[in-house]
From Swiss-Prot:
CDD domains: AdeC. Keywords: Hydrolase, Manganese. Belongs to the metallo-dependent hydrolases superfamily. Adenine deaminase family. This is Adenine deaminase. The gene is ade. InterPro entries: Adenine_deam (IPR006679), Adenine_deam_C (IPR026912), Amidohydro-rel (IPR006680), Metal-dep_hydrolase_composite (IPR011059), Metal_Hydrolase (IPR032466). PANTHER family: ADENINE DEAMINASE, N-ACETYLGLUCOSAMINE-6-PHOSPHATE DEACETYLASE. The lineage of its organism: Bacteria, Pseudomonadati, Thermodesulfobacteriota, Desulfovibrionia, Desulfovibrionales. It comes from Nitratidesulfovibrio vulgaris (strain DP4) (Desulfovibrio vulgaris). Coiled coil: none annotated.
Length: 575
C-alpha cells in the first residue's frame, strides 16, 4: 500500500487535531511487547491503532472488562482443506477471532496451476480476513502421478512480487534441498532475493541433515510431533509452527515444550482443518485454550498466536496493539476459555458472538470450474487381471495415513480378474486433468466397504479421482457423478447415487455456506458407515484422499499404478 495519503489523517487524529474513529474503554489490553496487561482507553482511526489515550471520537465501545487481544494469525493453512471457498472460510475463522492467515494453496495449484493461484489472490482481495499466500514449492508434489500443472521457479516468479505473497510455501522436497537440486534452490532463492519467508516441511530430519535444510534459509517447520524435534529446530534458529488440524493434532504433545526462553520462536497453525472442527472447537482460539491448559502463560500464548506469526512472515503492521498497526483485535471473556465476543478487522466490527456481521463477497472465476476432464470410461475400466491368485494389497491402518504392504490370496473370476470379497475392496485412480485415460487399479484391505462405492476428487496431492468399491458398476456411477458435479465426494449403491457433496471450485471447494457443507459431510459420513458398512475405525473420505499420496509408506496408488514408497518405484499388483 501507499502510506502517504494515510499519514496526515493518522497524525492529525493521534495529535488531537481531528476526532478519532473509535475509542475502546474498559478493556484489559494484552500487550505482547511488554508481556503485560494494559488498562487504558484505546484510540483507533483510519483502520489503525493510534495509542492508549482518551479522545474525541465518532464512536465508542465499552469492552465491559473483557480482554482485548491482537487479531489471531494462522501461520500455515491450506484453505482448500476446509472444503469451502475463501469467502466461506473467512466467515468460519473471523467468527473465531482469526484476522490473518498464511495460506499455502498447493491443492488448487496442483489442479489449476497459476490460474488457481490468481483465483486465490483475487478471491481474498476484498475480504476483511487478511490472506497472504505462500506460493506452492512442489507442484507437482512427485513425478509419480499426473497433476494438472507444473510450476517451476519461472512460473512462480510471475507472482512472487505481489505484496500479498508472503514467500515460498512448504518445501516438502527436503531430499532435493539436501542434494542441492537446482530447481529447488532456484525456488528458494526466488523468495530470499525479495526478503520473503521460505516455509518448511521436514518430518524426521535431524542432525546434519536438518542443519543443511536450515542452512538453505528455510525458516519454519510445522511437522514436529515431539518436543525433542521442536527444540532441535528452535536451536537452529527456525520457527516451529505448532499444529492442531483435523487429522494431525500436535498441540497437546508440543505445548509442554514451550518455555520462556523459546516461546518467541513458536507460532500456531492449523494446516488442514475441516469446517465441522472449526464450527465445534474453533480455530487459533482453540490453540490458545490448549496451550493454557498445558501450563503456557496466557500472555505468552497470545504472543505466539499474534506477534510471533506476524514477525515470522513479515507482517510488520500486524500482530500487536500498538500505534500505527492495523486495528485487528478480538474481545474475549477471559484468558483461559478465550470465548470470542467481538472481532474487529481494520477497526471495523466484523463478527459478534460467533457470527460474522458483514458481507463477504464470493468470487466467481471460470478458470477454476469444470476441472473434471476424463476420457470416457466403460464397464471394463476397472478390470484387474492377475496372473495368479496372489496379489499385493494396500493394508489400511486405523486412524493413520500409513499403510501396510500385504500379500494376500485374492478371489478371481473365470477370466482371472480380481473380484472384491473376503474383506478386500477394489481401488482405482482416474486421471482427471488432461483426459489421458490413465486408470490405476489396486486392492485395499481394512476399509470394510460392502454394497457400493465411494469416490472423491480430493486426492492428495495431484487430486485425480479416487474411487473404492466392491463392484465395477457402482464405481463407474460414482466417477460419472463426479464428472457431472464438477468434482466433490459421492456415495453410490445399487446403480444410484446415495449422496453427493459437490465441490465445483477445482473439485476441492464448495461455494455453499460452511454450515451447509458440514451438515452434508456429516450425513455422508453416516451413510458411509451405516449403509456402506465402512469400518468405524476409518474416516471414509480422508482415508481415500491420502491413499493416492506416494510419499507416505508403504503402498499407495496413483493414476500410473501401484507405488511402493519404500523403494520409490512402481510395482505390480500381481505377485
Amino acid at each position: 500500500m501507499t502510506y502517504r495519503p494515510l499519514l496526515n489523517d493518522l497524525v492529525d487524529m493521534a495529535a488531537g487535531r481531528a476526532p478519532v474513529d473509535l475509542v475502546v474503554r474498559n478493556a484489559r489490553i494484552v500487550d505482547v511487547f511488554s508481556q503485560s496487561i494494559v488498562e487504558a482507553p484505546l484510540a483507533i482511526g483510519g483502520g489503525r491503532f493510534l495509542g492508549f489515550f482518551e479522545a474525541e471520537a465518532h464512536a465508542t465501545l465499552d469492552a465491559e472488562g473483557r480482554y482485548l487481544l491482537p487479531g489471531l494469525i494462522d501461520g500455515h493453512v491450506h484453505i482448500e482443506s476446509s472444503l469451502v471457498s475463501p469467502a466461506q472460510f473467512a466467515r468460519l475463522v473471523l467468527a473465531r477471532g482469526t484476522t490473518a492467515v498464511i495460506a499455502d494453496p498447493h491443492e488448487i495449484a496442483n489442479v489449476c496451476g497459476l490460474a488457481g493461484l490468481r483465483y486465490m489472490l483475487d478471491a481474498t482481495r476484498d475480504l476483511p480476513l487478511d490472506v497472504r499466500l505462500a506460493l506452492p514449492s512442489c507442484v507437482p508434489a512427485t513425478p509419480f502421478e499426473n497433476a494438472g500443472a507444473v510450476l517451476d521457479a519461472a512460473a512462480l516468479a510471475t507472482l512472487m512480487d505481489d505484496p500479498r505473497v508472503a514467500g515460498l510455501g512448504e518445501m516438502m522436497n527436503f531430499p532435493g534441498v539436501l542434494a542441492g537440486d537446482a530447481d529447488v534452490l532456484d525456488k528458494i532463492a526466488l523468495a530470499l532475493d525479495r526478503g520473503k519467508t521460505v516455509d518448511g516441511h521436514s518430518p524426521g530430519l535431524a542432525g546434519r541433515d536438518l542443519a543443511t535444510y536450515a542452512a538453505a534459509r528455510i525458516a519454519t517447520d510445522h511437522e514436529c510431533t515431539t518436543v525433542e524435534e521442536m527444540h532441535e529446530r528452535i536451536a537452529l534458529g527456525m520457527y516451529v509452527l505448532l499444529r492442531e488440524g483435523s487429522a494431525a493434532r500436535d498441540m497437546a504433545r508440543l505445548a509442554p515444550g514451550i518455555t520462556p526462553g523459546n516461546a518467541r520462536r513458536c507460532v500456531f497453525c492449523t494446516d488442514d482443518r475441516q469446517p465441522a472442527d472449526i464450527l465445534r472447537d474453533g480455530h487459533i482460539d482453540n490453540h490458545l485454550r490448549i496451550a493454557v491448559s498445558h501450563g503456557v502463560d496466557p500472555v505468552t500464548a497470545v504472543t505466539i498466536a499474534t506477534l510471533n506469526a506476524a514477525e515470522c512472515f513479515g507482517l510488520r503492521d500486524r500482530g500487536a496493539v500498538a500505534p500505527g498497526r492495523v486495528a485487528d483485535f478480538v474481545l474475549v471473556d477471559d484468558l483461559t476459555g478465550f470465548a470470542v465476543r467481538k472481532v474487529y478487522a481494520a477497526g471495523r466490527l466484523v463478527a459478534r458472538d460467533g457470527a460474522v456481521v458483514v458481507d463477504l463477497p464470493d468470487h466467481a472465476d471460470p478458470a477454476v470450474r469444470d476441472t473434471v476432464n476424463i476420457r470416457p470410461l466403460d464397464d471394463t475400466a476397472f478390470r484387474l487381471p492377475l496372473p495368479t491368485g496372489l496379489a499385493r494389497v494396500i493394508g489400511l491402518q486405523p486412524h493413520s495415513l500409513l499403510t501396510d504392504a500385504l500379500e494376500r490370496d485374492v478371489p478371481r473370476d473365470a477370466s482371472g480378474c480380481f473380484t472384491p470379497g473376503d474383506g478386500l475392496v477394489k481401488l482405482a485412480v482416474v486421471e482427471r486433468h488432461k483426459a489421458t485415460g490413465n486408470v490405476g487399479v489396486g486392492i485395499i484391505e481394512g476399509y470394510g466397504l460392502r454394497g457400493g462405492a465411494v469416490a472423491t476428487t480430493v486426492a492428495h496431492d495431484s487430486h485425480n479421482i479416487v474411487v473404492a468399491g466392491d463392484n465395477d458398476a457402482d464405481m463407474l456411477v460414482a466417477v460419472r457423478e463426479l464428472e457431472r458435479t464438477g468434482g466433490g465426494i459421492t456415495l453410490c449403491a445399487g446403480g444410484r447415487v446415495l449422496a453427493s457433496l459437490p465441490l465445483p471450485v477445482a473439485g476441492l471447494m464448495s461455494d455453499r455456506p460452511a454450515t451447509e457443507v458440514s451438515e452434508t459431510f456429516a450425513q455422508m459420513l453416516s451413510i458411509a458407515h451405516e449403509t456402506l458398512h465402512i469400518s468405524r475405525d476409518i474416516e471414509p473420505f480422508m482415508t481415500l484422499s491420502f491413499l493416492t499420496l506416494p510419499v507416505i509408506p508403504a503402498l499407495k496408488l496413483t493414476d500410473r499404478g501401484l507405488f511402493d514408497v519404500r523403494t520409490f518405484s512402481f510395482t505390480t499388483v500381481g505377485v
